[in-house]
Amino acid sequence: MSCLRNYYCRAFGYKQSRSCYSRSLNREIANESSEVERRARSLRVLDIISSKSGGVSNRQDHFGFVQEFRQTDSWRFRGQAISEDFDLSRTKNGVSSVLEEVMLEDSSSSVKRDGWSFDAYGLSSAVRSCGLNRDFRTGSGFHCLALKGGFISDVYLGSSLVVLYRDSGEVENAYKVFEEMPERNVVSWTAMISGFAQEWRVDICLKLYSKMRKSTSDPNDYTFTALLSACTGSGALGQGRSVHCQTLHMGLKSYLHISNSLISMYCKCGDLKDAFRIFDQFSNKDVVSWNSMIAGYAQHGLAMQAIELFELMMPKSGTKPDAITYLGVLSSCRHAGLVKEGRKFFNLMAEHGLKPELNHYSCLVDLLGRFGLLQEALELIENMPMKPNSVIWGSLLFSCRVHGDVWTGIRAAEERLMLEPDCAATHVQLANLYASVGYWKEAATVRKLMKDKGLKTNPGCSWIEINNYVFMFKAEDGSNCRMLEIVHVLHCLIDHMEFL
């Protein structure tokens, strides 16, 4: 098997090697019983993870392609006119042939040449099509065309480019395009706000909204959905309330997606009373409304309320639960330790024609593990119809630490490291587990691997809202200039919890 693994390494690289060797390990695991076999398996796992390099991100800076183009001037155009119904149906293996049809090297730039032409509206349509097809490289090529043709000042084309870079995860580059736009419309403003909302940068979102209100563009319902998303992600209740007031002022109370966003925001920020008030008052609830409220109860450990709402869902509204609904109710059972109910809802999915997905299995594994049913959790993982991910193994590892099952914990840590070889926390946990059973050599090997890879555990961050501003801080970190206020608010919260 080692020869076969080495062959895969040479011929195809790391991923196939891991897949081939992992299948061999899984077959051998079933027959492991003796101390010698356990130690041998540990050595094999360490051999695998030590040979793995960290995964290199495939994320590209597509805007860099445009910056390179700005420094050179060697593009020309040919091809059929780009029209409003343009699409990327002619793509091959994810690399578009469109640019090859539209651009050649070393010739003069002309927006109309030999009977072929394009305009800003056509380019805008082409950029949108690139975004829909996730072909961001080609989209940046059309950005170059816009620069070459002098169309970059067009508001519709600029908005399409902002959306393109936002969807590619390059929010800062989207903002560069946005800043260069001489004119902006509601699409460009909303796209920029939603981009920063995805990163939970609520302060920037609100500043952009303030600038938008001073411009000629009026916000629409999607603008407020983006703002509420930012408040939801960062837990900014005060700012979320301000956005809520703005939606009422703008007459958007009856919009379903606004109501759903408000329910999610209030639930995430801990104000379940206001969340349920909006939920209860809205007559045209959809499955998202029910899911948001059930998930809110689950998040705050109110399992019985979540289950009661779930059981009312179909009789009261006729709304059929979906996979996300079951994820919410299973999560509520997990937090409350309701093993019997968790098994029931997991099996109930089949009655609604739903197949459990990875997240559902993860919830049930965590529920069983928290209750100390570690062998049942392990059997569930081994019998899953899909390959377990690192989250599931991490959940089992945590439960093993709590309940003192060292050997199952070692198995979970080893499996997780094979999936995430650069996870510093798992390295530390595995080293500690090896040490607890006297595997000193293996523990030293794991710590050496950490040192060689330069892995360090990252401290967790916390957020707190003071006077409508959200501040981030870390344990034993006094660098925040508002630390005294943060500590004061924390002490007030602790006193309040002790009083309850």
Curated annotation (Swiss-Prot):
GO term, biological process aspect, one: RNA modification
UniProt KW keywords: Repeat
Pfam families named among the record's database cross-references: E_motif, PPR, PPR_1, PPR_2
Molecular function as annotated in GO: RNA binding
Record carries keyword Metal-binding: no
InterPro entries assigned to the protein according to its UniProt record, in alphabetical order: E_motif, Pentatricopeptide_rpt, PPR_At4g14850-like_plant, TPR-like_helical_dom_sf
Keyword Repeat appears in the UniProt entry: yes
Annotated stretches, region: Type E motif: 392-467
Per-repeat ranges for PPR: 119-153, 154-184, 185-219, 220-254, 255-285, 286-321, 322-356, 357-387
Region (Type E(+) motif): 468-498
Matches recorded under SUPFAM superfamilies: TPR-like
Domain of life, source organism: Eukaryota
Family: Belongs to the PPR family. PCMP-E subfamily.
Record protein name field: Pentatricopeptide repeat-containing protein At2g37320
Native organism: Arabidopsis thaliana (Mouse-ear cress)
Taxonomic path: Eukaryota, Viridiplantae, Streptophyta, Embryophyta, Tracheophyta
